[in-house]
Regions:
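Loop-helix junctions at membrane interfaces
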Residues: 3-262
């Protein structure tokens, strides 16, 4: 009689324990996957910071700026960059709606042209942190990582090349080089890591993302054609527009913002 009464409870308890174990295993798996993503982000940030620091060691002597003034300039440029980043907009005839175009690299470049490569990485990082605090993320943080890393692939080469000679001609070459680096690196990074990770973290099938691209360009049928026909043109357009604005505004903005005459 007792066995008849307690047997269902035993089976129920065992089933509940098995389900809880399964849920905990799934939770730890998700934590491990997200931890890997976080560690990847940190590794990229540290790598870019070290690259910028190394580049500065081989550049000609830069302007002497007090620490307080350096902090204030980076802070002002990062704040402006954050506002421009929040004002991003989709370009539906080029790429799916989760790809946005913004001009936040403009103040980052102005900051880098004045202070050097390290300032660009710091400015980019502060921009992303402020954006996350003010607006959060709509892309499971993948878009924020992309904006930081791909943005650095644009502003770092441009800033490093500009500081070699500090002339308008050098600025043009640097901005052109930065646009090329951003287009090539951004396209490859999207294909190899960002898009698959976005699909994984956001719970969206990869085929669905490719299908969004096919709706815009009929020639898209896999991830390679997706990044070539959607991501690359978007990066080229952004690089070209920000480059033109930087050339037009740097000297004009440098006078009131940085207090320089040349």
């Amino acid at each position: 009689m007792l066995a008849f009464i307690f047997t269902p409870w035993v089976y129920s308890g065992a089933y509940f324990f098995a389900q809880e174990t399964k849920n905990m295993n799934a939770l730890w798996t998700q934590i491990a996957e997200n931890l890997t993503f976080v560690l990847t982000c940190l590794a990229l940030v540290v790598g870019l910071a070290l690259l910028a620091k190394l580049a500065e060691k081989f550049l000609p002597e830069r302007r002497t700026v007090t620490p307080a003034r350096r902090v204030s300039i980076i802070g002002i440029c990062a704040a402006i960059a954050t506002v421009l980043h929040i004002m991003d907009f989709a370009v539906p005839f080029l790429a799916p709606g989760f790809y946005k175009l913004d001009f936040s690299e403009l103040p980052v470049l102005l900051c880098g042209f004045y202070l050097g490569p390290c300032a660009t990485v710091v400015c980019e990082g502060i921009k992303i942190l402020l954006k996350l605090l003010l607006k959060g993320t709509s892309t499971a943080f993948v878009g924020d990582l992309a904006n930081f890393v791909v943005g650095c692939s644009f502003v770092l080469p441009a800033t490093i090349w500009y500081h070699v000679h500090k002339s308008k001609h050098s600025a043009i070459i640097g901005l052109t080089l930065g646009t090329i680096c951003m287009s090539v690196f951004g396209t490859a990074f999207n294909a190899v890591y960002l898009i698959p990770k976005f699909a994984e973290l956001y719970g969206m099938p990869l085929d669905a993302i490719i299908g969004m691209g096919t709706a815009i360009h009929a020639g898209i049928h896999n991830i390679t054609t997706f990044v070539v026909m959607c991501v690359a043109p978007l990066n080229v357009v952004k690089g070209a527009m920000v480059s033109v604005l930087t050339l037009l505004l740097y000297k004009r903005v440098a006078r009131p913002l940085f207090g320089i005459r040349s």
